[in-house]
Amino acid sequence: MNKQSITYTILFTFAVTFVFVLLLSLTNQATVEIIERNERVDRQRAILQAMGLDVSEPEEVASRFQDVEEVEEDGLTLYAGTVDGSQVYAKEFRGSGLWGTIHGVLGVTADLSQTTGLSIIAHNETPGLGGRITEEWFQRQLEGEQIPQDRLLVTDGDGDYEYGNGEIDGITGATRTSDSMEVILNRELDTLKDALGGS
């Protein structure tokens, strides 16, 4: 066959494409269970971290997550557990950020007087700006933060050094993401209050 012909070019392109698509499909099939297991562990880790439990190893995540109970309250799926002898709840959320959906977990005490943690699972925010919501310093602000008047406030400026006042430092340069997080967190607090019968 003439290597300069259109027929050869089309057949060669088809054969190479077929081989690479086949290899890609086989790789996908071989790793689908691993990917699903890793996604499940990441989700469970996020729930545990939002409840105030710090876990890192996958085996530890699976072990600790066995103590978490999935509870249905008013059609919502909540996760209930005990941390240091106190009942805590966590709820997955999805809300609109600047560029897309922010998916995370918010944890609260049973009496809704304070948050126990925040964990961001996925987002589409700008790397280096709004994407900083996944950084430890941002998420740790919600560990033990008081919830005065059923609201959290994301602030800008010099920083919030008064821990436990219901104010969270926003991210400099990511005003829209910070505003979105305030809306999402307060919406979730309202939802949790309705589900758990808070005042």
Regions found by a protein language model. Give the residues of each.
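Flexible, solvent-exposed loop/hinge segments and secondary-structure transition points
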Residues: 2-199
